Amino acid sequence: MSKFARRCAALMLAVVLLCMAVPAAFAAEGDALPAGATTMGGANTTLIPDEEENCLSWLFGSGDTITMPYLNVKGQGLRRNVTLDLEDCLVGITYTELGSIGSYVSDAAAQQAWKAQAVAIHSYLEYHKKYGSSANALVYTPVDQIPSSARSAIRRAVSEVKDEVLTCNGSVIDAVWSASAGYNTQTGVYGTCSGLDAWGTDVPYLQSVESPYEEQYHNLMRRVIGKDYRYIEYNDSKTGQPYESADTTHKDLGGFVQYNTFVSNGKSYRYIGQFVSSRYCFDFSADENGTPCMNYYGFGHGVGMSQCGMVGYAQEQGMGYRDILRHYYTCLLYTSPSPRDVEES
């Protein structure tokens, strides 16, 4: 079918769908709307029907751009309805996340790490667009603010994978990641945290997996992306009270305190995030003076892909980006063309 014929057909379908939608707009005020699915964060996913959305994108052409409901832009803060060139978008966010790692690992390893990060970013953005959630956890660095050597190297990686997303059972996944995973003192294994243990929601592709290069690469990644991986805390962040006692004995593969198992000063916490910021891997102990304290390791929620771990896999084992992604995002998972390419084919 010619491009002109395709667009004519799409236009006719769009008109039909619009005519069907008009009566619904004048429905009685008390009419119930469809509930829609929800994300892990509880966002309602009642959206334009996929057929209509795809039809309009096919008709008018999405090209190589991506539009996000919300996005943090470096130096500009949180912006709404941001439209960017897809490749520039992935280059800018990948740089924010991983920086110039090519200065610290081999070019081949850096390329695979950047590719893995870019595919995870693209999947995350598409997931949150699809389900009506804001993707404002990400920060886009405008490409003209990225040093030219880093920009060129990252663009070389991104250009080869910009049309790939991650799917599980046919749907794009919420490809979350964090700077590092943790260490389980009980098993002696470094690994990630499952979605169930971190947030109380069992997600098939967010399971605990081993991630052996955390300790080896955390100092490197701290220099690259400027995040602290170790610190000591003397007060409970939720109450501001000094620690007197705590129980952190129930841990998952990654050494993260499990869902609904932390007790501090006699109080049980249902969600770990209610009392610390974003660091969830810790042990209760005492400092050299005998003062009770929390020793934290890692940065981030520890769920999904570990940035320290994936850089380690690329450098130490020569692992390619697809194998890295399959390792961290379990389930029957594969990479595929983005919805944008399917519509344009």
Labelled PLM ranges:
Residues S2-S336:
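Conserved, single-site charged/polar hotspot
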Residues Y334-S345:
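Single conserved hydrophobic/aromatic residue that forms the stacking wall/gate
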